[in-house]
């Protein structure tokens, strides 16, 4: 791999890799996808490998220091700037000229939607950019609702999908008024949040006011600095400088198991989906770390209805609660971007990434005969006993890690070493103590 800094016009290019990825589907023409991320999450590298193995040429827009810039299955990377994200997007798209754009986090998905909105259709270049975004993500008229939790819940109800009633609130009076109707426990959520952040479960009236204050102060300087030091993440600084206050909503708490669906879709039709039940996660509302592949007709039907009414394309995900009384699936969140289980094989032996790649290639999706769905709990990358032998993951035997990818093994090891640094542990300990005092 040639790992040097080059400049192509106004684009900051992080690396160029001329080595062909191993284990990919051979073809004389491989559609190109531009994978974009605002964060240094190792899961994005796992997604890149799956896209490459499905027969796609993968380029990436990512922050400096991301593992995407040094793996052989990503052919080229461009520098993402947290303080000028739209310029980063526009320049990388122009330089890459991809067949499809795949956002891997809510931040870049929202920025793509904003770029579409702010780009005037006045010339051929602008028209091409807008067409590519719409081609990659689906009907642009629905973009504004993607980040409104109350809006998505209302749309779900209209489509006949079970979902807790979600109401926007703006002050303490509205908060306590809604609590009188909903009862306890209740869930407060902020629009635009993801990964379990911006969510608070409140059990008593005494917890309500501090939780409301914490979520409305989501973009304070202290939080931005904490994210920069702990996670090397500068993405909160721009909202902090803009003094952005998120819209809050409230819904009743649903008792049951968490589940989600990773989906590939095209112009409002589902190509493939994989449904999983969450066995373990980072904190109560955080991303799943251990899942089990399941077949759930209620989830599958809900996904088909939502994809159709939103007229979606590309990769996306839906989060559900499986009711503890009857197992029915209730929608609690929508993720307008690729999610971390989209490379898994479903109970029907379909795979979202493979199906999307086949659609781009104009071929039917073909799953290798020797592959079969996991029968038990799967520890998702980058977690697992090989990297954290003393953790609770040691009791699981199924690990989401290709045996022929030493690059991903190295990335996972680096992730756990970084997570266990003394300074990071100290900040997280202080953060937990502060949260306990606030809530």
Which functions belong to the PLM regions below?
Residues 35-46:
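A short, glycine/small-residue-rich beta-strand->loop->alpha-helix junction that serves as a flexible
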Residues 60-72:
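Short, glycine/polar-rich helix-capping loops at beta-to-alpha or helix-loop-helix junctions
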Residues 70-170, 176-177, 194:
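Conserved N-proximal alpha/beta basic substrate-recognition cap immediately N-terminal to
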Residues 164-166, 186-231, 258-260, 280-292:
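Glycine-rich phosphate-binding loop of ATP-grasp-fold ATP-dependent ligases
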Residues 213, 219-281, 294-299, 322, ...:
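Phosphate-binding site of ATP-dependent enzymes
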Residues 244-247, 284-326:
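A long amphipathic alpha-helix within ATP-dependent nucleotide-binding catalytic cores
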Residues 337-353:
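ATP-dependent carboxylate-activation loops
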Residues 354-439:
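Peripheral (often C-terminal) accessory segments that flank ATP-dependent C-N-forming ligase machineries
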